[in-house]
Design a protein with these regions (language model features):
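Active-site neighborhood of HAD-like aspartate-dependent phosphohydrolases
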Residues: 1-37, 41, 45, 59-63, ...
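Asp-based, Mg2+/Mn2+-dependent phosphohydrolase catalytic module
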Residues: 2, 106-183
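Short beta-strand segments
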Residues: 5-7, 14, 100-104, 159
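Alpha-helical elements of Rossmann-like donor-binding domains used by nucleotide-donor carbohydrate transfer enzymes
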Residues: 19, 23, 38, 52, ...
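Hydrophobic alpha-helical core bundles mediating ligand binding, dimerization, or RNAP-core interactions
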Residues: 20-21, 53-57, 72-75, 109, ...
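Short, charge-rich amphipathic alpha-helical segments embedded
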Residues: 64-68
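Short, acidic loop-to-helix structural element flanking the phosphoryl-transfer center
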Residues: 69-100, 138
């Protein structure tokens, strides 16, 4: 194995639940499903805006748009590195592995996460909002493999969604389904 590819949300970064208000935890309950809702997937794809997503969530929840916008801002601001994964990234880099990011992520989230020092340890990235394709669609994996000249059989994907690992395996790569409960 030469290349290790990390997902971001739920693998390298997460909201510390002890810092989240009950409202925030309840607000994002729609994300705790095997597949993301279509409106959120389009947000990650970069084909819908923060304003559109905020309006959709407002309509779903009956909460004012301003409240939904504030909760979304808080959701971004509370992202922080998952300490065991952050240490693993550092250890793998020190051991000479090539490290990459492959993540479904909106512009607001990725711009915030790129500010963390651990992000500088990666050799490359493919982020859904910049490529207009999302996992588990094969194209986003192909972009990563082609852009960085990665051989699938030498590449390990770490993701918190089984369907994304299955998509990597379909291209000949290896995968580990990650769980924050095991950190």
């Amino acid at each position: 194995m030469k290349n290790i590819v990390f997902d971001l949300g739920g693998v390298l970064f997460a909201r510390d639940k002890s810092k989240c208000t009950p409202e925030l935890l309840e607000f994002f309950s729609f994300l705790r499903t095997p597949r993301m809702p279509l409106f959120w997937e389009e947000y990650d794809r970069g084909t819908s805006t923060l304003e559109e997503v905020t309006a959709t969530i407002s309509g779903m929840t009956g909460r004012p748009v301003e409240t939904c916008a504030a909760v979304l801002r808080l959701a971004v601001d509370l992202q922080e590195p998952v300490k065991p994964t952050e240490r693993l990234v550092g250890d793998l880099k020190a051991a000479g592995y090539r490290l990459y990011v492959l993540s479904n992520m909106s512009r607001e989230f990725i711009d915030f996460l790129r500010r963390f020092p651990v992000y500088g340890l990666f050799d490359g990235e493919v982020v859904s909002c910049e490529e207009h394709t999302v996992k588990p669609e094969p194209r986003i994996y192909e972009i990563l493999l082609e852009r960085y000249g990665l051989t699938p059989s030498e590449t390990l994907f770490i993701d918190d969604r089984e369907m994304n690992i299955e998509a990597a395996a379909a291209l000949g790569a290896y995968g580990i389904t990650f769980s924050l409960h095991n950190t």
